[in-house]
């Protein structure tokens, strides 16, 4: 029988961290061996905090002990700067990062890619692990060839720190690359309230909504003569991200170098 994948989870007491622990605990080929938190949950059993019962893994408060349990993979949903710090420590230790937190800069990604290449070890960074969200981005890329007029509305819970979301930025980049032309504005716009038309990424307006009761949602709205096309994805709870996260956790061990975006794993 093959050995189980040894998994560590950072941000273990957060919403995504707890969901990841539940998902890992339910897999016959995985086992949780380490967990990292900040304040909430530190010193408690990770399984108890996640709601699946004691797993015998205590949530640590400092990353220094994270690799003592010799994990194969580090699942990390901490914000960008902390995730970068964890990855820089993980890769030299032979631990493969699977990062879902947003906020990493291009310089951060380039540095992590270089580190992974030098150590010949895999890593996955994905703005969104929901398979439906990946398909939404792909469908939007296809639609952009025929509908160059497009705007993006992304909606998230009110605890999300970054705006716009990484998914919205990645969608804008994919749409911009696929468009055969950039349409001019129909009129010269005058914003009587600054920011009313949203922020622009790759020339595409993005509108961010943050409200209690939301989880993660995005609409990509295309317009053409006499018609509109809306491509929408909704994550109604954290479980929507788990199939993609588990796929990345299994596949990262066979990778050499950094993969950015879950779609790269679906294509291979």
Where are these regions (language model features)?
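Rossmann-fold NAD(P) dinucleotide-binding segment
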Residues: 66-69, 73, 77, 81-100
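Residue-level detector of anion-binding/catalytic polar loops
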Residues: 96, 122, 149
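Rossmann-like NAD(P)H-binding beta-loop-alpha module
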Residues: 135-147, 163
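Short glycine-rich anion-binding loops that position phosphate/pyrophosphate groups of nucleotides
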Residues: 41, 80-81, 103-104, 128-129, ...
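C-terminal substrate-binding/catalytic lobe of Rossmann-fold NAD(P)-dependent oxidoreductases
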Residues: 3-10, 15-68, 148-268
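Rossmann-fold NAD(P)-binding glycine/threonine-rich loop
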Residues: 85-88, 92-93, 101-123, 139-141
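Short beta->alpha connector loops at strand-helix junctions that form conserved
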Residues: 11, 100-102, 127
């Amino acid at each position: 029988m093959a050995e189980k994948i040894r998994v560590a989870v950072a941000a273990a007491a957060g919403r995504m961290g707890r969901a990841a622990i539940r998902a890992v605990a339910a897999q016959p080929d995985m086992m949780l061996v380490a967990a990292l938190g900040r304040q909430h949950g530190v010193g408690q059993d990770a399984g108890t905090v996640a709601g699946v019962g004691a797993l015998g893994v205590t949530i640590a408060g400092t990353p220094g002990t994270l690799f003592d349990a010799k994990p194969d993979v580090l699942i990390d949903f901490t914000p960008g700067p902390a995730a970068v710090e964890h990855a820089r420590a993980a890769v030299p230790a032979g631990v493969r990062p699977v990062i879902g937190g947003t906020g990493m800069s291009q310089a951060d990604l380039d540095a992590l890619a270089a580190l992974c290449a030098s150590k010949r070890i895999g890593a996955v960074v994905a703005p969104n692990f929901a398979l439906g969200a990946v398909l939404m981005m792909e469908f939007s890329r296809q639609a952009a060839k025929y509908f160059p007029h497009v705007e993006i509305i992304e909606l998230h819970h009110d605890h999300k720190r970054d705006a716009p979301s990484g998914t919205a930025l990645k969608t804008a980049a994919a749409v911009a690359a696929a468009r055969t032309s950039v349409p001019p504005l129909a009129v010269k716009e005058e914003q009587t309230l600054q920011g009313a038309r949203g922020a622009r990424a790759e020339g595409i307006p993005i509108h961010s909504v943050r409200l209690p009761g939301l989880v993660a949602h995005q609409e990509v709205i295309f317009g053409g003569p006499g018609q509109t096309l809306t491509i929408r994805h909704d994550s109604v709870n954290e479980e929507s991200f788990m199939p993609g996260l588990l796929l990345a956790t299994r596949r990262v061990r066979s990778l050499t170098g950094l993969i950015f975006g879950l779609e790269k794993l679906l294509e291979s």
